Swiss-Prot record:
<dbReference type="GO" id="GO:0006412">
    <property type="term" value="P:translation"/>
</dbReference>
<comment type="similarity">
    <text>Belongs to the bacterial ribosomal protein bL33 family.</text>
</comment>
<dbReference type="Pfam" id="PF00471">
    <property type="entry name" value="Ribosomal_L33"/>
</dbReference>
<protein>
    <recommendedName>
        <fullName>Large ribosomal subunit protein bL33</fullName>
    </recommendedName>
</protein>
<dbReference type="GO" id="GO:0022625">
    <property type="term" value="C:cytosolic large ribosomal subunit"/>
</dbReference>
<dbReference type="GO" id="GO:0003735">
    <property type="term" value="F:structural constituent of ribosome"/>
</dbReference>
<keyword id="KW-0689">Ribosomal protein</keyword>
<dbReference type="InterPro" id="IPR018264">
    <property type="entry name" value="Ribosomal_bL33_CS"/>
</dbReference>
<keyword id="KW-0687">Ribonucleoprotein</keyword>
<dbReference type="InterPro" id="IPR011332">
    <property type="entry name" value="Ribosomal_zn-bd"/>
</dbReference>
<dbReference type="InterPro" id="IPR038584">
    <property type="entry name" value="Ribosomal_bL33_sf"/>
</dbReference>
<dbReference type="InterPro" id="IPR001705">
    <property type="entry name" value="Ribosomal_bL33"/>
</dbReference>
Length: 55
């Protein structure tokens, strides 16, 4: 079978709350690590989320 173009990634909160989102990204077009600002419900504010591996 062929390797899939989209991979699942885990977006970890940089606030240190342990909260994370799981999303998909295209591994061919987005080769660098993903960072995005999203809402952290534990910290109750928008923080930066950085890409990490799904364990």
């Amino acid at each position: 079978m062929a390797k899939p173009t989209t991979i699942k990634i885990r977006l970890n909160s940089t606030a240190g709350t342990g909260h994370f989102y799981v999303t998909k990204k295209n591994a061919r077009t987005m080769t660098e690590k993903m960072t995005i600002r999203k809402y952290d419900p534990v910290a109750r504010k928008h923080v930066e989320y950085k890409e990490g591996k799904i364990k």
